[in-house]
Regions:
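Bacterial Sec-dependent N-terminal signal peptides
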Residues: 1-29
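Subtilisin-like serine protease catalytic core
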Residues: 177, 187-226, 232-282, 296-299, ...
Length: 483
């Protein structure tokens, strides 16, 4: 009891410190004035110039091959949003902009989702936005973002180019990351050469501070970056370091300091979390990032993001909505396995608050939701619990996250707490396992990992199926391949 109370007090003090720090940052008036983003769900995909027999027009060769290898056919959700409807919207926008005062922000399309058949439109003119929602080809419309009055001024953070002498653990190859990989028996996959080579992981996060200059990442296989947040950051690598920490648990390769769980994998860094506000449009950004990951041929999506409440929108979601399909973000997440990808998503850190449960999209079907354990393999009190509204086991897995060893945006070795970090630790080992068992499809990999977790026969709402054993998953998976 004493240890749990101490942990609770520590977490509460940490959250208070973070909130106090955020409150003290300098502010500036939101650039461009008051404007809004509305989401329009279209009726269908008629009047389109795209056809399912020519997917190479919008999907990469790697994406098409991934589906072909897993026997997954294309369907109507894969088709881009109707080019005919987009042209109609663009004509309406052009007419609206011609009558707009120069002091106002011009209207424009800022994104689409082919899986959800939606379009995002930004404008300062709410009359125009409502009129657009009345068009025959629009099924539903909703305001999903409102410009804040002010935002924080960006403060550039310099990175360290060398580790401190005490960061090195002589004679310990994995350095400070030893416990988090050994808890999952993943080091044994590394020992026989499976370190994620040939696997592409898309990291969906809010920022990757200094990943372009921290020496640790200079030798990582970072294939590319993309920003889905409106407006795009003027300095992609100076946003929050949350994604930097996440990436380090997988991609770091610093012997005796920190070796991540998939140092040989390839990574795409996709920014889809807006740090300035918490609004429903972030679900759209996440969906656009997930679809982009699909189109470039990613094998795994790791996401340490979760939502359950939004600014000035009390009651937007209820716990009964945790069914994997009500929230746009969860509905999108539930489609990843159908496209041949494995989603590894954090359970969320709401366990100590009034919500307590997992957050969206941790309720997604056919995904691996990860909670956090402490070093004694006891669940962290902040880790979100299940089950889903339709009584599926959640979280699926547990891993070290209270605390985990990471590299911060300053390039320093630190320990931090959250399901945000237990999640990529697992995602990296999913990459290693899939490298070792390339004949498996996404659903088979997901089920294999669940089945080789230590509570598979007696899952509950706190630990899910328990702690996965990736070495045993490999051994069992290899046996089934040989049959």
């Amino acid at each position: 009891m004493t240890n749990i109370r101490l942990i609770n007090l520590f977490i509460a003090a940490l959250f208070c410190a973070l909130n106090a720090s955020a409150a003290s940052l300098p502010k500036k008036k939101y650039p461009g004035g008051k404007c809004y983003i509305w989401r329009y769900t279209l009726e269908d995909k008629r009047e389109s110039s795209y056809t399912l027999d020519r997917p190479q027009r919008w999907l990469s060769h790697k994406s098409i091959e991934r589906r072909h290898k897993q026997g997954l056919p294309l369907d109507s959700t894969d088709l881009p949003v109707s080019s005919g409807y987009l042209k109609a919207i663009e004509h309406m926008i052009a007419d609206a902009n011609r009558s707009t005062k120069r002091s106002q922000t011009e209207s424009m399309i800022i994104g689409t989702s082919r899986w959800n058949n939606t379009v995002l439109v930004r404008s300062a003119d709410t009359t125009f936005l409502r009129r657009l929602g009345e068009q025959a080809y629009v099924k539903r419309s909703e305001m999903v973002w409102e410009a804040p009055d002010s935002i924080e001024r960006m403060i550039k953070i310099k990175a360290n180019y060398n580790f401190n002498s005490w960061d090195s653990l002589k004679g310990v190859p994995y350095g400070h990351g030893r416990e988090q990989i050994e808890m999952l028996n993943g080091h044994r996959l590394h020992n026989i050469g499976f370190r994620g080579k040939g696997i592409t992981i898309a990291v969906l996060d809010g920022g990757f501070q200094n990943c372009n200059c921290i020496p640790t990442f200079q030798h990582a296989n970072i294939s590319g970056i993309k920003d889905f947040v409106y407006p795009n950051s003027p300095s992609f690598y100076q946003e929050t370091d949350h994604g930097t920490k996440v990436l380090s648990t997988m991609a770091a390769n610093e012997p005796e300091v920190l070796i991540g769980t998939a140092p040989d994998a390839h990574y795409w860094l996709l920014r889809c979390e807006d740090q300035e506000t918490e609004q429903p449009v972030e679900e759209d950004y996440w969906a656009m990032a997930a679809e982009f990951a699909d189109s470039l041929g990613a094998d795994i999506v790791t996401s340490s993001l979760g939502y359950n409440e939004y600014d000035n929108r009390p009651g937007y979601y209820r716990q009964r909505d945790l069914d994997g399909h009500t929230a746009l973000i969860s509905r999108t997440a539930s489609m990843l396995a159908q496209k041949g990808m494995v989603l590894v998503n954090s359970a969320g850190n709401s366990g100590m608050g009034p919500w307590k449960k997992i957050t969206f999209p941790a309720d997604a079907d056919n995904s691996l939701t990860v909670g956090a354990l402490n070093q004694q393999r006891v669940n962290a009190p902040f880790s979100g619990v299940g089950p889903t509204q339709d009584q599926r086991v959640k979280p699926d897995l547990m891993a070290l996250g209270s605390p985990a060893c990471l590299i911060s945006g300053r390039g320093a070795v630190i320990r931090d707490m959250g399901t945000s970090f237990s999640t990529p630790i697992v995602a990296g080992l999913v990459a290693c396992l899939w490298q070792a068992l390339p004949g498996k499809n996404a659903l088979e990999i997901i089920q294999l990992i669940r089945e080789q977790s230590d509570a598979y026969d007696k899952p509950d709402n706190v630990y899910g199926f328990g702690v996965p054993n990736f070495w045993r998953a490999y051994m069992i998976g290899r046996l089934t391949n040989d049959k």
